[in-house]
From Swiss-Prot:
GO molecular function: 2-C-methyl-D-erythritol 4-phosphate cytidylyltransferase activity
Alphabetized UniProt keyword annotations: Isoprene biosynthesis, Nucleotidyltransferase, Transferase
Pathway: Isoprenoid biosynthesis; isopentenyl diphosphate biosynthesis via DXP pathway; isopentenyl diphosphate from 1-deoxy-D-xylulose 5-phosphate: step 2/6
This protein's name: 2-C-methyl-D-erythritol 4-phosphate cytidylyltransferase
Reaction catalysis annotation: 2-C-methyl-D-erythritol 4-phosphate + CTP + H(+) = 4-CDP-2-C-methyl-D-erythritol + diphosphate
CDD domains named among the record's database cross-references: CDP-ME_synthetase
Gene3D superfamilies associated with the record: Spore Coat Polysaccharide Biosynthesis Protein SpsA, Chain A
Family: Belongs to the IspD/TarI cytidylyltransferase family. IspD subfamily.
Keyword Nucleotidyltransferase found: yes
Sites annotated Transition state stabilizer: R17, K24
Site, as annotated: Positions MEP for the nucleophilic attack: R142, K198
Length: 212
């Protein structure tokens, strides 16, 4: 049986690249704020028994009627995750971006199983494009690369220790499993089985509608 997990749902981003008059995670999508699609899916996952929404207090009303905890958003992603960790009571935690509307229960269950083998795991997909490094220009082997998605599953104490180390060493993390990497803990990669999208630009909403 999989252990119970907490979910940190990150909703503190400003969404400057999107160009809307409000953060993109709160834009209407299929009749409700975008982030609620992820939240409603999370509620269907039996392993999740605690949800912490990290957001600006002015947006807490959007989650009225949901049994969630709130934590204030930080300046950086890792600051927001650290803020959410203060409310986590489970030994395992999932972290998910609020601008990713799709969470699939079967993938999350597999992710939790795999994470227990090493201490950390993330969803990934293959790179379908040719990727070139800049300065100097060099073609990279795309078979050795992966596109990283969320949610990511990490042992709570590992995530906390890694974030504290990053803070001491003044390292900016680009994803949450990097906290495990800093500690020398291997990260397991779990291939996603369903379409994933992160809403970054207006055209991404069109793609998300098509994926429903």
């Amino acid at each position: 049986m999989n252990p119970k997990c907490s979910l940190i749902l990150l909703s503190g981003g400003k969404g400057e690249r999107f160009g809307a008059n409000q953060p993109k995670q709160y834009l209407p999508f299929q009749g409700q704020p975008l982030i609620l699609h992820a939240l409603n899916s999370a509620l269907l996952i039996p392993e999740i028994n605690e949800i912490i929404v990290v957001c600006d207090a002015s947006y807490e009303h959007i989650f009225e009627g949901y049994s969630v905890k709130f934590a204030p958003a930080g300046m950086r992603r890792q600051d927001s995750v650290f803020s959410g960790l203060h409310h986590v009571t489970n030994p395992w935690v999932l972290v998910h971006d609020g601008v990713r509307p799709f969470i699939y229960p079967d993938e999350v269950s597999e992710l939790i199983v795999i994470a227990q083998q090493t201490g950390a795991a993330t969803l990934v997909s293959n790179v379908p494009y040719t990727i070139k490094q800049r300065n100097p220009v060099k073609t990279l082997d795309r078979d050795s690369l992966s596109i990283v998605h969320t949610p990511q599953c990490i042992k709570t104490e590992i995530l906390l220790e890694g974030l504290e180390l990053a803070d001491r060493e003044q390292i900016t993390l680009v994803d949450d499993t990097q906290a495990a990497e800093l500690l020398g803990i291997p990260v397991s990669l779990v291939s996603n089985k369903h379409p994933q999208i992160k809403i970054t630009y207006p055209e991404d909403l069109t793609i998300a509608h098509a994926l429903l």
